[in-house]
């Protein structure tokens, strides 16, 4: 039996969608809180009616945890009003989240931005998939106001009023629709719209989540179109990682064939862990719905990915243990080197002490004046004649004078040599002091 308007209780109005009013309602049968979109199709043109039918059919076909769930539709032919009953997202939309961040002057956490990116990309993957008859769904109006959050801040993509189904034999849609701030360069140039146009809009949305403003702004649509075709925009705030900035920059590439696909985005290392977690949760939900335990088959690509992650973690643990062993070995080597340095320092101090004693001893010996070797000429045998004579007296005086002069010269030479040795010892002492400081520096 089809549902009636009387089966629901209107609680209050939430806002206005693309072509109608949204109201929060309660289903009387079980008290479940839902929302319906109230649309007056009597005032619509044939094109608008066609778009309305398209949205209803899409909502019935698209079933994904990150897409707003469709529950029912009610046709009031008397008042030419269509009610589309959908899931209620009590977390509001991303537009209100951005407005709050702008008002509070507080940026959103990168973890939240990455989670939004992951869940939105998974929703777009469901839309862009070429299965179930080869249909591809383009959202064509991806913006913060059309992305909703549930009570746990999970993303829900909604408002498919502008979406259009593409078949295999029709690769592009050419209708000029969408929100100007998020329109792609090909839309601004009146070119064909494809899956990569949704990727551009996703990049604009993620950019606005980070910067709290769109990447391209202008006072009129002509100026905005020029800026979008030029493709220049500022980097997202530096509080966000380079990886996130690079991925958003790739999404906002002027050439659509250079933009990443949904599969390439999901394969990014930046969100690989989040993707695996979302896929695991989705499988658990399916298991609960079917009443079977949520076991993954061995052939499941998700299980293979989880096993790969586990192996990678084990490899990282082994690498960390190996690094710990290396660090312990280095610590032992440092202890040995420290002991060797202490031994070298003790030997150096002992050598310095011995050299100091030797220096003092040698200086004392030089000051005492050891016996001097006389020259060979002074050692000639003297001729003695008995009795005193003038010759003998003169020779004796000359010998004494010669000996005194020779001794003086020899003493000067020895004093000079002692000074040279003292200087050499001082240099040696300085050298050992320097070596001692170097040894201490090794510690």
UniProtKB/Swiss-Prot annotation:
Top-level taxonomic group:
Eukaryota
Region labeled Required for microtubule binding and for localization to the centrosomes — which residues?
333-370
Look up and give the organism this protein is from.
Answer: Mus musculus
Q: Which SMART domains match?
A: S_TKc
Oligomeric state and partners?
Forms homodimers and heterodimers. Interacts with CDC20, CTNB1, MAD1L1, MAD2L1, MAPK, NEK11, NPM1, NDC80, PCNT, PPP1CA, PPP1CC and SGO1. Interacts with STK3/MST2 (via SARAH domain) and SAV1 (via SARAH domain). Interacts with NECAB3 and HMGA2. Interacts with CEP68; the interaction leads to phosphorylation of CEP68. Interacts with CNTLN; the interaction leads to phosphorylation of CNTLN. Interacts with CEP85.
Q: Give all Phosphothreonine modified positions.
A: 170, 175, 179
Q: What does this protein do?
A: Protein kinase which is involved in the control of centrosome separation and bipolar spindle formation in mitotic cells and chromatin condensation in meiotic cells. Regulates centrosome separation (essential for the formation of bipolar spindles and high-fidelity chromosome separation) by phosphorylating centrosomal proteins such as CROCC, CEP250 and NINL, resulting in their displacement from the centrosomes. Regulates kinetochore microtubule attachment stability in mitosis via phosphorylation of NDC80.
Where composition is biased (Basic and acidic residues), the residues are: 282-292, 385-398
The name this protein goes by in its record: Serine/threonine-protein kinase Nek2
Extract the ranges annotated as region (Necessary for interaction with MAD1L1): 329-443
